[in-house]
Regions:
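Active-site loop/helix belt of alpha/beta enzymes
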Residues: 1-81
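Charged (often Lys/Glu-rich) extended helix/loop segments that serve as interaction or gating elements
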Residues: 51, 60-173
């Protein structure tokens, strides 16, 4: 009350803080997934509000929250075509037509994006490096990730690309 009355403050922005599901991104879109025991400790908007509202309500201020990533993160995907498959005997690579200029987050932050075949596959999963065509060592979407074996012409979906994926894209190389 003191903040509002003595200082003329009307709003309190608590910022963001709500993350998204990177692993199980696709499965977490199903309500049944959230009923699992493993999901009980995940911070949801309801749990966030239940924790903060009782503490902030006495201030008498309008509370602002910035849930952008929570809303848009899993709303976008990057679909890419496998251009070439390379097996060195020690490493298995899927070289795709998307590159770090299309989704820079893995190169910048080593961020995790679930990668799945667009067409469901019963192929055996193999540890795969999914890499782009740019001549940079950072043009890598994942390393040693178990992904069903792919072939040239297959399409992969990189999930959780909705927040910042497009706005951070560039025209490099």
């Amino acid at each position: 009350k003191k903040l509002k009355d003595q200082h003329g403050i009307e709003f309190l922005s608590i910022g963001g803080g709500l993350g998204i599901m990177y692993e199980d991104a696709l499965a977490s879109g199903d309500v049944k997934w959230w009923n699992r025991k493993a999901a009980k400790d995940i911070l949801t908007p309801a749990k966030y509000a239940a924790t903060l509202v009782p503490r902030l309500k006495p201030l008498g201020l309008k509370i602002l929250i910035e849930p952008g990533r929570f809303i848009s993160g899993n709303a976008g995907i990057l679909v890419t075509r496998v251009e070439h498959v390379k097996n060195t005997g020690k490493k298995y690579f899927a070289i795709v037509d998307a590159a770090m200029n299309d989704l820079i987050r893995p190169a910048f932050y080593e961020s995790y994006h679930e990668i799945i075949p667009v067409k469901q596959s019963k192929a055996r999963a193999v540890k795969t490096d999914v890499v782009g065509p740019i001549c940079e060592t950072g043009d890598t979407f994942c390393k040693d990730r178990p992904i069903p074996r792919v072939a040239e012409g297959d399409h992969l979906a990189l999930l959780s690309a909705g927040a910042y994926g497009f706005v951070m894209a560039g025209t490099y190389n």
